[in-house]
Amino acid sequence: YHMKSTDELINDLKKQDQTSFLENETDYVQSGGAYLSKLLKEHHLQPGNLIRDLELERSYAYQILRGTRKPTRILLLRIGFYLQLSLSEFQRMLSICQRAILYPRNRFDAAIIYALEHNMSIDDLNDLLEEIGEPPLR
């Protein structure tokens, strides 16, 4: 299975009429759950690793991975740190999961971007968040 690039998808969309768009709409949209499952696979992790290491409620985690529940933005940020994603990977994950991307003019988000760019651990990030009066990632 060949995953089309964004440019290929845009070119396809330009050429399609409404009927063919409606028939093929699922080719363009990836669910948050499917994307998170793919990220776990790419990092050679099982859902059980994520559940244990992030101390998630088992059924909630599986509902997220199946796409029947949307993860909170905080949970996505925790998952991103757990998987050691880059800033661009974080933004993509947040966008696909329909959550606000990190915005540098927001103090909380700026601290997260800083932590990412300086390879800080989640514990160090939580200390930094506490120092600036923001809630920790828990």
Regions found by a protein language model. Give the residues of each.
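Recognition helix of helix-turn-helix/homeodomain-like DNA-binding domains
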Residues: 55-71, 96-98
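A short, Lys/Arg-rich alpha-helix, primarily the initiator
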Residues: 12-46, 125-138
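Short, basic-rich loop-to-helix N-cap that marks the start of a DNA-contacting helix
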Residues: 68-80
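Short, charged recognition helix plus adjacent turn
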Residues: 1-2, 10, 91-120
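Key DNA-contact positions within bacterial/archaeal DNA-binding proteins
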Residues: 48, 59, 88
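Long, compositionally biased
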Residues: 81-83, 107-136
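Short alpha-helical "recognition helix" segments of helix-turn-helix
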Residues: 46-53
